[in-house]
C-alpha cells in the first residue's frame, strides 16, 4: 500500500483555488480480498495541515497578458503545493487545472494562450506530473463540473457504495454559471435517453458502479454574470444615459453608485427586484420538449417527495452570510429575512458591519449585492428548478425526506459535510483514483477509460487505429531515407545495382515476411483509417495504448458537453 497525492486547481471566474488530496493505492494486483468500497480520499496529505489556497482574480483576467499567468497567478499556489507534498513523490503527483465558467466566456484563442502559458510554466518550474497538457490543463464544460459536484456530494454522504441507498441531487451556482445534476429514476430513462450521462466509478473489489445522470448547465446564469445582465436590463428599461439616475430595487435604500457615467440609486424593494430578476430566466425561450424550465432547457420532472437536492457555492453563501440560514431550507423564513434586509437603510447596514455585528466573512462588497443575489437565488430555485416553496411534500407527508439526517426539506444549502468542504474537485479526484487502481490490474490490461469512467475493452490492433497516419508517415520517411541511401551508395553502377538487388532478396527471405505480410500491409493501415472520424479539438476519440503507469487516467479525465462546446487547446 502506497500513498498517492493529487493537485487539483479550480480556476473559477473570480479566483483560482488549489486543493491537495491523498489516498491509499494498493499495489497488490489481487482483487479477491478487496472489500466493496470506494477509495478513501482525504484532504491534504493526512497530517491535518492546510490543504487549500486561493488567489484572486481568476485566470481569465490574464486574457490580455497570458504570459504572466504563471508567475503572477500560479506560482503562489504551486509553491504552496510543492512545500506541502513530500518532494520524493513530486514526479508521480498529477496536477489538474480545470478552468470553469469564467474561461468559457473568453474566445478560443484567448483560452488557448492562457492555458498554454500555464502548462509551460508548471512543466518548467515544477517536477509534478503533467503527461498531457490538453487533458491536465484545460477548460472543463459545465456538465463536467456538475457531474463532479454530484459525485463529491454523494461520496461524502456515503450514498454511492450501496445501490439501495437514494442519492441526492446537486445544484451549484458559481459566479458565471449554474449546474444541476441528479440521478434519473428508472421510469424516466426511456424518455430522456438522449440526455443521460452515465458515470462509472470503480470499487476496490474490481466492480464498477453505474449511475444514469441528468446533467446540464446554464452559462451566464451565475450570480456575477446575472448581476451584469441585470444592470444592463436596468439601463435598457429606463433608457439610461450619462447624467441620468436610475432606480435599483435590488440595492438598499440610500446606496448610490456610478457605472460608466450612469448613476444608480437603491430603492430596496424586494418585490420589484424579484420581478426584474425573473425576467433574467428567459422563461419565454422555447424548449424542444416539455416541461420547459428556463432559457430553453427542459429538466426531467422531479418528484420532490422522493428526491432531495443540496446546493453549494452561492446557494450557501447567500443563505448563510448575514442571514445565518444555511442548511435545511425554509422558504417563508428565508423570504422574510431577505425582505427585511432589502428594506434596510444602507448606512444602517454599514454601521452593523463596522461594529462587527455581522459574520466575519461579510464585507462591504457582499452587502452591496446581497439583496440581488438573494432575489436571484429565490427565482432560480423556485421559478427555474421548480423547488416547492412549502416544506410539505407533494403527497402531504409532513416530514419530507430523510436522506440527510435531521434535514426535512427538499433543498439544503451546504458548505461542508462531516467537516469536509463540498467541492467538485473532490468528484474529479474520486473518478481519477477509483478507476486508476482498476486499470492497473492485469484483468484490465486491454481496457481504457472513457470520459465518464467506463472501462472499455480495446479492439484488436488498437495501436494502429490510434496512430494510422503517424505510422504511415514514419514508414514512408524510413523508405525515402533508405532509397536515398541506396542511390548514394550504389549510384548507377550496374555491378553495385546487382549486388543491391541480391541484398534485397536475401532481406526479403529472412526478415521481410514479418514486415511485408498481410498483417502489416499499407492496405490494412488504410482500411483502419476509414473507421476514424476527424476529431474536433474538444473531443477525444479512440482507445489509448495500455499502460500500468499512474498517467493512464490523467489522459482520460476529459468530459464533453452536449450543450456547451468548450474547445480544448491545441498544445504543442
From Swiss-Prot:
Give the UniProt keywords, A-Z.
ATP-binding, Golgi apparatus, Hydrolase, Membrane, Nucleotide-binding, Transmembrane, Transmembrane helix
Enzyme class (EC, first level): hydrolase
Q: State the free-text cofactor note.
A: Divalent metal cations. Ca(2+), Mg(2+) or Mn(2+).
Q: So what does this thing catalyse? A: a ribonucleoside 5'-triphosphate + 2 H2O = a ribonucleoside 5'-phosphate + 2 phosphate + 2 H(+)
The Gene Ontology biological process annotation of the record reads: CTP metabolic process; protein glycosylation; UDP catabolic process
Record EC number: 3.6.1.5
Pathway(s) of this molecule = Protein modification; protein glycosylation
List residues in topological domain: Lumenal.
1-470
The subcellular location is: Golgi apparatus; Membrane
Active site, per annotation:
145 (proton acceptor)
Name the cofactor(s) required for activity, per the record.
Ca(2+); Mg(2+); Mn(2+)
Q: Where does the source fall among the domains of life?
A: Eukaryota
Q: Which residues form a coiled coil?
A: none
Please list the residue ranges that the record places on the Cytoplasmic side of the membrane. Answer: 492-572
Family, according to the entry, reads as follows: Belongs to the GDA1/CD39 NTPase family.
Function, as annotated, reads: Catalyzes the hydrolysis of phosphoanhydride bonds of nucleoside tri- and di-phosphates. Required for Golgi glycosylation and cell wall integrity. Involved in N-mannosylation of proteins in Golgi.
What is this protein's name? Golgi apyrase
Source species of the chain: Schizosaccharomyces pombe (strain 972 / ATCC 24843) (Fission yeast)
The primary gene name is ynd1
